[in-house]
Amino acid sequence: MAISVQHVVVLLLSTLLIAITFFLFTSDNARFPFPSLSTTDYYTPIPKSPIPHRIVDVSSDQTPQKMKLNTSLEVGELKWDLCKGAESVDYIPCLDNYAAIKQLKSRRHMEHRERHCPEPSPKCLLPLPDNYKPPVPWPKSRDMIWYDNVPHPKLVEYKKEQNWVKKEGEFLVFPGGGTQFKFGVTHYVEFIEKALPSIKWGKNIRVVLDVGCGVASFGGSLLDKDVITMSFAPKDEHEAQIQFALERGIPATLSVIGTQQLTFPSNAFDLIHCARCRVHWDADGGKPLLELNRVLRPGGFFIWSATPVYRDNDRDSRIWNEMVSLTKSICWKVVTKTVDSSGIGLVIYQKPTSESCYNKRSTQDPPLCDKKEANGSWYVPLAKCLSKLPSGNVQSWPELWPKRLVSVKPQSISVKAETLKKDTEKWSASVSDVYLKHLAVNWSTVRNVMDMNAGFGGFAAALINLPLWVMNVVPVDKPDTLSVVYDRGLIGVYHDWCESVNTYPRTYDLLHSSFLLGDLTQRCEIVQVVAEIDRIVRPGGYLVVQDNMETIMKLESILGSLHWSTKIYEDRFLVGRKGFWRPAKPELR
């Protein structure tokens, strides 16, 4: 029977349509088909922060419309450009917002070193430094790093007489010197031990805050004594010192005591250290020292090594007398004051463990804070009042390390002992059975870790025996558990993941997210969060996500557009690994 040409055409078209349909529903990009919705259908803006925001002048040419995705997130729809600007290699969005900084009415209180986040957050990618290499592995990195990874010659020149850092061939070498470490940091730490033998590193002193830390040699030295130090300094006070610290594998963050509280909970640190940290403690009615008092635990120590302690000229004597009056007004007592054979001196203060001294002061100046403090110190102004001490027997806390890792503070309202025990057991089993055995992570290359939704710090506690450290982040829209993290002898910060982190690019080997990123889509675009993750993670580093499959599929597509390699495990875990790919530089016209 003859078949007409029309029948043949219809048959061929039908066959082609069936083949196309089969391909669409079996291809990788269609494994998890979603309704075609724009990000604007599930995006609601983040509430305005108290800090004025301005659009940053380091950006790509792309418009917000080019970056919008539908929820199917097909890789081909995402186009990335390099950030523009001479400083884009080391760009930190919330600290490099020059347009906002130019509009500040005052810089007297270091306002220009505080956070001023751009709106919208940039979605461009940062270029790599020329000749960037995988970092020197730990522990060798504590003593030397690749110069090409952090090519900042000014600090080397500026601090060459103080033995902070030297350039030797392809490397930057850290001899362990410093402004106050004339005989080296090891000698300086021993000097502290002799000055106050009751300081037992790695036992009653586990969590330390180093103010104005330089290249963090003090904190790096204490790692050998089972002490973890949160080292901080403002950006560019000396060129890239915090970047050097993190490249070395030493815990550090960018921060400043300016007009706002530090992003740490109250009563957190066992010891605070300042060696010529250039903070005027008596400024603005003593607010900077009152902030240290807030984050120092009852019975904790403050070590101050600066010229007013051991020199007698008019200027230093005036500063010392002001410090005497201020510390007396907040009931800190001097437990020792001494000078080393190097000519460097220090004084060690101790915070009281009871409020009896507060009530006996002849004048209530500074006054006690009249309201219960919220631990969440995110964009909270500095207060000119004296923080009340926690209730209960604070003299018995904390437990000696490492027992405190699994202990709960008496009268704790943040967590009960049984809750912490179950959380610890859950994370211990998950890390040993899944993270270390089955996920595509080479843990021998991992040193700097950030847990994006840390909870009680269970993930960090489960990794405690590995040669790495964890920055535990408690999101500001989650339950406030950061005080528990510090009680356990771990470190961390508050943060809003709809904004950029106070850290340099390429500073973490692994970011971990447990059921965080899916919730964030209610407040900000997941694309901007992934762009921030790409900024933070080093080439060769990892993103490990535990979440629902919908979130994992979205992330897999976005990471694919960034040329990250990805693997999914048991439909619950996604491991992404960053490569060296960057978008092509725009052609000069």
Swiss-Prot record:
Q: Which CDD domains match?
A: AdoMet_MTases
Pfam families, sorted: Methyltransf_29
Q: Name one GO molecular function term.
A: methyltransferase activity
Q: Which domain of life, per UniProt?
A: Eukaryota
Cellular component aspect of the GO annotation: endosome; Golgi apparatus; Golgi cis cisterna; Golgi membrane; trans-Golgi network
- Glycan-carrying positions: 70, 375, 442
**What GO biological process terms does the UniProt entry carry, in alphabetical order?**
methylation
Give TM segment ranges: 5-25
Topology term for the membrane? Single-pass type II membrane protein
Show which residues sit on the Lumenal side of the membrane. Answer: 26-589
Keyword Transmembrane found: yes
Record-linked InterPro entries: Put_SAM_MeTrfase, SAM-dependent_MTases_sf
The places in or outside the cell where this protein is found are:
Golgi apparatus membrane
Main location per UniProt?
Golgi
Q: What class of enzyme is it?
A: transferase
Full protein name = Probable methyltransferase PMT23
Q: What species was this sequence derived from?
A: Arabidopsis thaliana
